[in-house]
Amino acid sequence: MQYILERAKSVLEEFGGRDVFETAENAGVNVWFRTLGSLKGFYIFENNCRYIVINEELDDITKGVVCAHELGHDMLHRKLSVGGIRENTLFLANNKTEREANLFASEILIPDDDILSALSECDSVKRLSAQLGFPSELIQYKLEAMNFKGYHFKLSDVKNDFLK
């Protein structure tokens, strides 16, 4: 967990702020929008080029979450994707990588202070989700990351595959 949090922090500091699309581009990752049917997105590393492909039919919030998640795969699991293996075939078999990418995404997209501020008005993950505009599963990952940092939030089980 420590490595994921440190990696997310360094990515934000080195490549940009909370605009995940700009951050990805600044990090040298090409972000493309395509029609992908039921697939929300995938990451690919091929011929020393890095790509995040996002379903153009998603709403803007989901596009951002998918981009942050796939950027997590780039920053944490790049070597697992060598040779053009796409997320829908590689990462479904390994929940650890999905969990790590989701934790990374939560750190990239949601500042701790936003959670702490929203808690003055919200008493549940569902309400935090509505207040902050992110999926409740991503909020859960953020709370888990904050617990690792020393906060004490009650957590329920989180699905690794909420972006599938």
Regions of interest found by a model, annotated:
Residues 1-164:
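Active-site hotspot residues in diverse enzymes, especially metal/ion-binding acidic/histidine motifs
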